[in-house]
Amino acid sequence: KLVLGNYSTVRDYLDVDDFSRGLILTLDKGISGESYNLCSGIATEIRSMIELFKKSLKLESPVKFTENVSTDIDLPYQVGDNKKIYELCGWTPMIKLEDSIDRMVKEL
């Protein structure tokens, strides 16, 4: 049995291939000194991420979530906005989180 806390934390996940493609486009078309967010822009709760891993790994074991415990540095919501990089060069993530996790699991 897996026991986890702080399951309601929300994050933005991006596949490494999407990141690499975005980085290359940014290096090629980006404006020096400007900042660009390479992110999915999709809010994903930790609980959902764990369920995707369980599904991909075909795990039946339960996950117990403890009280929502957080640390002083643990932001409850952290999701980026990729509008600027999209407007610059049309970059948008192409790989769904579930597909990224499935690919990761197959590599194990």
What positions do the PLM features span?
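Amphipathic terminal alpha-helices
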Residues: 83, 97-108
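Glycine/proline-rich active-site loop of Rossmann-fold NAD(P)-dependent oxidoreductases
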Residues: 2, 16-18, 25-37, 42-45, ...
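Residue-level signal for the nucleotide or nucleotide-sugar donor/cofactor binding architecture
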Residues: 8-17, 41-44, 73, 77-80, ...
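Short, flexible, glycine-rich and Lys/Arg-enriched loop motifs at helix boundaries
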Residues: 1-7
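Generic structural signal for alpha-helix termini and adjacent loop/cap motifs
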Residues: 26-30, 88, 107
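C-terminal "lid/loop" region of Rossmann-like NAD(P)-dependent oxidoreductases
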Residues: 6, 35-36, 44-51, 58-77
